[in-house]
């Protein structure tokens, strides 16, 4: 039995979970998320209102889908109650970010032009100062993907560490060429 998959998912107050066959919908104070469960895995509610994820047998694929499904549904419950946030920071002389509203950011990252990033559905941006900002939303996957796409615009380079990085990320530094 999967160690993660067998754990019941506690549903906090204010969160409504609808189960309709293979379709799961989670509604909470921050929004609504839905998910279609792959065929051999079944989702049900127990007497206390917790969600149970079960598999028919110990086939390899079913074992992996069991833990995955439980984790995805748990992430949905956390997303609609607390939400997710990825913090990023910019390092480099003249590198900065400007907010063009909660759905758009403008980056000056050493290119000949500013780079404008639009937020996908369900994502908002918050700018703390010109070198720190965050990506927020209820869907963990979309928040992480949006943050990764922004980081990809100008990855931290290994010599001076200039670029966009996650908060707390350690950039591996290289030694420059030795002078005479």
Swiss-Prot record:
Any one cellular-component term (Gene Ontology): cytosolic large ribosomal subunit
Keyword Magnesium: no
Organism domain of life: Bacteria
Gene Ontology biological process terms from the UniProt entry: cytoplasmic translation
Keywords assigned by UniProt, alphabetized: Ribonucleoprotein, Ribosomal protein, RNA-binding, rRNA-binding
Pfam families: Ribosomal_L6
GO MF term set: rRNA binding; structural constituent of ribosome
PROSITE patterns: RIBOSOMAL_L6_1
Family recorded in the similarity comment: Belongs to the universal ribosomal protein uL6 family.
Cross-referenced HAMAP family: Ribosomal_uL6_B
Assembly and interaction partners: Part of the 50S ribosomal subunit.
Task of the protein: This protein binds to the 23S rRNA, and is important in its secondary structure. It is located near the subunit interface in the base of the L7/L12 stalk, and near the tRNA binding site of the peptidyltransferase center.
Name the record gives this protein: Large ribosomal subunit protein uL6
Organism annotation: Cutibacterium acnes (strain DSM 16379 / KPA171202)
Taxonomic lineage from the root: Bacteria, Bacillati, Actinomycetota, Actinomycetes, Propionibacteriales
Gene for this chain: rplF
